[in-house]
């Protein structure tokens, strides 16, 4: 199982991915990424050397799953990833307007986190608001905060 799965890898997903690798949070081989287009997958693989998934469900078979897609795509993407999520997976959403309870209901996950990153994350200087669901223990929260701090500060 991969340590981190990115479902979507646009501007913000790439910023977070770059931070994770630059900070040494994990190796490129520990990360799997899915994207809407093969062009994006090829570019991300070439730039970062990460594993690429043939579908969103494969990217969701990770210890921590980052949902980095546009809010209007959440319904369809969650339908793809929910069956693949491990019962212990930490599901991280960056979509505005999607509450913790909505995410828990739609994904079936126990460990849900909402992040509100900003664009300076692209240069490692982001300030990210973090909201934890009830299912995370202190070790889970520490993992999430280490992830957030790889591309800036978190609170």
Please tell me what each predicted stretch does.
Residues 1-47, 51-54, 60:
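NAD(P)+-binding Rossmann beta1-loop-alpha1 motif at the extreme N-terminus of oxidoreductases
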Residues 27-30, 87-89, 111:
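Short acidic capping loops at alpha-helix termini that bridge into adjacent secondary structure
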Residues 50-107:
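Rossmann-fold NAD(P) dinucleotide-binding segment
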Residues 54, 93-94, 111-117, 154-155:
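General beta-strand structural signal in soluble alpha/beta enzymes
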Residues 102-111, 127-155:
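Internal alpha-helical scaffold of NAD(P)-dependent oxidoreductase catalytic cores
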Residues 114-129:
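Active-site capping/gating segments
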